[in-house]
Amino acid sequence: MNPEKELDVARSEFIKSFNYLVGTLRMNGLSRKVAVGLALMTLIGGRASIRNASITFKLNYANLLKTLENLENTWSDYLEALSKVIIGPVVVIIDDTFDHKLYSRVEGIASKYGNYFAWCSTHKRFEPGIQVLTIALYDLAMGKSYLIGAFPYSTRKMWESGMVSEFKTKIEMAAEIIEVLKERFHVARVVFDSWYWSEKLVKGSVVSELKSNRRLIRVRPLEGGKTLGVEGHPHVGDLPPGSYLAELTLGDQVITIKLLILVYKDNRLNLYTTDVNLSDEEIEATWKIRWEIEKFHKDIKALGMQDSSFLKRKRLQGYLLLFVMVVNTVRDLISSLNLKSVEELLRFVEYV
């Protein structure tokens, strides 16, 4: 194919992908001009901000801010559209990330409406930013992942120090969202890291990781061997690599899990599942699926998620939802154009 023909195909794919996104936005009653402006916001030069979009597309800035507040209601429409695309079993991936807000107008204190001064675990200090719960779906039949939600939340430390006036833990938020997803998708398994150990989440078919200091009541190797009930109870870290059936406490109850201990890239992994019938290979494969969400974190930050801050949480939630929809569209576009990354796509768009 000659270069001019390749460019024509690229333009066609670009228009098709973003027309789908614009159509989703318009389901909430937005005009086409506003929907196009929001859909293309992350691809215009400079910061991916609402003000930049209003200037570029000659849209009313105040009206765009109000539109963001209404975008929160678009989430159910977006899930409905995805449920028609994903018809097979899925794995729900739960994680979180820190969204730095370098341009936040809030300095040293939290916003009355949101938490714009949060603890950054990377830099070990409070910084302008937001803790964001992220949730993705992995289509087992097609081997494709979709980011389906990004939700700001407050930490317990912020609540106890009086920095925010509303509080819901990421575990409570994740549990609520999983129930919503089960109504629309065939959820085969849920995967998350060890920080989500809670009776609200560790139920059904879960694959996750245990900390090495977690105590076990009883443990039995699956390849022969007798049940161990060591006085004082063994820690997970005391066990050699292998597969085990183990009993341990979760809240006020005792549960049985399948424990798979691996050495992976010189690191020890203490994987477990509540579905004791899963094979070792299925457990490991499901755990590797969890890393799909880290790619989403990289992509939404490359698209400029951190470029704007808002005093009202509803506007922030709308802004995050916009990035959720855009990143899925961009990923489809990257694949169809045989590009390698969001950064490469952004360079490509300059010439299309």
Regions found by a protein language model. Give the residues of each.
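Single, function-defining residue in the core of a domain
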Residues: 1-30, 34-37, 44, 57, ...
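Electropositive nucleic-acid engagement tracts
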Residues: 25-33, 40-105, 226, 344, ...
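Short secondary-structure transition/capping motifs
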Residues: 42, 67-71, 123-125, 163-170
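Short linear Ser/Thr-Pro motifs
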Residues: 49, 121, 273-274
